[in-house]
C-alpha cells in the first residue's frame, strides 16, 4: 500500500486498510458492511477516536481509544487521565499519565486538579475508563459542574450529546449528586420555594377546613361573670343544694354579685 493511502486511517477501527473498498482490516478484522435493505438504518459504529467534549482540550473515551497512540497523537492529545486503578498505562514514554487509585469512589477533586493543570498548560487530555460509558463520563461531568458552573442534569446532557454511549451507573450518579450538593448546596436551598418549607406541626395533621373544628359557647348568652339581672337579689345566689344558713354577727357575708 502506498504511503499516500496510509495517511488516512479507517475512521472506525483506526487501522490502515482499504475500508472504502471493502478490504478487511488485517489487525482487528473490521470491514465496511455491504449496503442492503436488511441493514438497520439506526446501526452505528463506535468510532476509534475519542469523543471531543470541550474543543481542543477535553476528550472522553475507552481503554481501546487510549491504546491507539497514533490516533491520540493525530488529535493532539498528550495527556491521559486513567480512571481505572487496575488499568495499565501503555505509553508512558509518549504521554503524561495520571491515575485514580480508588475502585469504588471516584476522586473528583483529584481528577479536576489534574485537568486544571492540563488546561493551564494548554494540553489536550483524554479521560478514559474501560468502556468509556460510566466511570470516565462521571469524572467529566463532575469537571463540568465544578469549572463551568453547570448543574448535574445540564452537564450530563452535554456529555451524552457528544458521546451517546454514555451510561453512568447508579452508584456513580449518586456520587455526582453528592458532589453537586457540595458545590451548589447553599444556592439549591435558597432556590427552594418558601411555601415548600416544612411546618412544625409536632406530628399533628393540619386542619384545612376550619369549619370542621368544633365551636364552643356559640349561643348568644352572656357570660356567667357578667352582672346579674337586677330582679334577682344577690342573697338568692347559693353554691350548694342546701338552704343558706342564717348569718351571724361573726360571719362575713359572701358577695355573690
From Swiss-Prot:
Region annotation Disordered: where it falls in the sequence: 235-257
Location relative to the cell: Nucleus
Enzyme class: hydrolase
Organism domain of life: Eukaryota
SUPFAM superfamilies: (Phosphotyrosine protein) phosphatases II (SSF52799)
GO biological process: abscisic acid-activated signaling pathway; auxin-activated signaling pathway; intracellular signal transduction; negative regulation of MAP kinase activity; regulation of organ growth; regulation of rate of cell growth; response to abscisic acid; response to auxin
MF-aspect GO terms: MAP kinase phosphatase activity; protein tyrosine phosphatase activity
InterPro entries (alphabetical): Dual-sp_phosphatase_cat-dom (IPR000340), IBR5-like (IPR044212), Prot-tyrosine_phosphatase-like (IPR029021), Tyr_Pase_AS (IPR016130), Tyr_Pase_dom (IPR000387), TYR_PHOSPHATASE_DUAL_dom (IPR020422)
Family (UniProt): Belongs to the protein-tyrosine phosphatase family.
Known function: Required for the transduction of auxin and abscisic acid (ABA) signaling pathways. Dephosphorylates and inactivates the MAP kinase MPK12.
Name of the protein this chain belongs to: Protein-tyrosine-phosphatase IBR5
Organism of provenance: Arabidopsis thaliana (Mouse-ear cress)
